[in-house]
Amino acid sequence: MSESSRPAVVLSHRSYNAKTGLAIVCPMTRQVDKGWPFTVRVDQTSGIIADQVKSIDWRGRRARIKGRVDLAVLEQTITTFSRLILPATSA
């Protein structure tokens, strides 16, 4: 990994990742107490920045799996991102 490597959570399915060599990710941060509305907390010291979705060449970057997040955290990340792209529904 290069010095510029940063942790990220993969949103895309492994079949997409394998076929394309790309992965759709959200970066992680340690700045969880900033009050950013689109940061999903993973634990006391880290969060996922759900409004910074990126497509990366994981093969070219030699990305490696470092860990996993709970399914509930992944679902919350996707829900948080979807608020940016889907129209609000009236209750």
Identify the role of each PLM range.
Residues M1-A91:
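Conserved functional hotspots at enzyme active or ligand-binding sites that engage polyanionic ligands
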